[in-house]
Amino acid sequence: MAKLLYVTCNLKPTEFSCSLSVGKKFLDEYLRQNPADEVYFLDLYRDNIQRIDADVLSGWGKMRNGESFASLTTDEQRKVGHIWKHADQFIAADKYVFVTPMFNLGFPAELKMYIDAVCVVGKTFAYTPTGPVGLLKDQGRKCLHIHSSGGFHFGKEEDHSVPYLKSIMGFMGIEDFESIVVEGVDAIPDRAESFKGAAVEKARGVASQF
């Protein structure tokens, strides 16, 4: 029995979102194929994600200098503990699905905040004399990114969404990465349903092997 962490970052209702609607079709097929697996849902707009702020940096700095977690201020403990909670949840999963829209050639800031919360030295990566090393190379972990954009950007230099997520997953040791991209729905609106339909078919195929 595997644990799937399903992370969404979209303000639209599912029926009005290309990425969420494709994600739902993926999840329906995945659960049909893997009914015993555990799925954990994280909505980055709804759920409170702790950003890295002055208290977090101060707390981390104190602990690097040998101070205990118990010696941190109340705010430092609360905020660092919140980040650790998300990092531990991420580590506990075997599979990851991120469902996002494109915002200005990237993705919403809430996803970057979440990535900062799970990329924690000593938990998901470590520094070595030869460079950083991902600590999540075990368990055959895999990641799927379901992403949508109004224009055509995937595979181009200006795309800072899918390539970044693939890179940061690899940074933590998760090398098995796949993407499903719905694009062009605003650029060619009369073909939007065709674009979404193709993505749904791909999502169902990926779900059967994920």
From Swiss-Prot:
Its EC number is 1.6.5.-, 1.7.1.17. It catalyses: 2 a quinone + NADH + H(+) = 2 a 1,4-benzosemiquinone + NAD(+); N,N-dimethyl-1,4-phenylenediamine + anthranilate + 2 NAD(+) = 2-(4-dimethylaminophenyl)diazenylbenzoate + 2 NADH + 2 H(+). InterPro entries: Flavodoxin_fold, Flavoprotein-like_sf, FMN-dep_NADH:Q_OxRdtase_AzoR1, NADH:quinone_OxRdtase_FMN_depd. Keywords: Flavoprotein, FMN, NAD, Oxidoreductase. Disulfide bonds: none annotated. The keyword Mitochondrion does not apply. Its cofactor is FMN. It comes from the Bacteria. GO terms for molecular function: electron transfer activity; FMN binding; oxidoreductase activity, acting on NAD(P)H as acceptor; oxidoreductase activity, acting on NAD(P)H, quinone or similar compound as acceptor. SUPFAM superfamilies: Flavoproteins (SSF52218). FMN binds at S17, C18, S19, S148, S149, G150, G151. The keyword Transmembrane helix does not apply. It is an enzyme of class 1 (oxidoreductase). Binds 1 FMN per subunit. HAMAP family: Azoreductase_type1. Homodimer. Quinone reductase that provides resistance to thiol-specific stress caused by electrophilic quinones. Belongs to the azoreductase type 1 family. This is FMN-dependent NADH:quinone oxidoreductase. It comes from Geotalea uraniireducens (strain Rf4) (Geobacter uraniireducens). The gene is azoR.
